[in-house]
């Protein structure tokens, strides 16, 4: 199994690994998928080295800018897919949706008290970098952020490019060595990773842990979340399953025409993957 390249791994704090901890935590924040994900691969590397099980934590805040029913529903549909994938492979998964602003305060520290180490996603946009830095200062164990944003690692570039043309020239020269570094297609299937038979008893003070039934049909309880309820769901379904269906449609019906018709809006030959790429449901 290929190791995660060092250039993709960033230490967020100066804490060490708590080798006597009960589990390794993958704190999912941007790459909300359990396939082809360097951050998940890194968490599993720690699991194998420490012989500790994995705890997958996928939280969703309610107080981020533009929080709406539409965005929440899309992310929660992805949680449903992730919960099913973790269950198929015998791993513990916690999909947690904040029910009131600040309702998750202290949760990560509580989990970290029993963890060996934390791994999260290294994503350069929105409120996530600031949040990761703040959490890193509060955790008593090592927090690593791992870049799984694209084929080229973010830290392979040592400058800000003034134009897309300048970046493309750099990319054409520098991308090739990184193309052989691939995340694992089915990382949770590894039999060498111990399994956590059930979720740790850590969530009583933080209501929001979602049952399979709540993830399957969030329609009713979403009404109780203090988000913009006027921005309703669309016909799009979130999650890896729907993302792969969209990708398959593009490859089988649109790709052959894309080269000549991509600039024709009425041709509808674009991939249509933007919503799923945005939330990391597919890479």
State where each predicted segment sits.
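Trp/Phe/Arg-rich N-terminal binding region typifying the photolyase-homology
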Residues: 1-187
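Glycine/tryptophan-enriched, flexible segments
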Residues: 19-20, 160-283
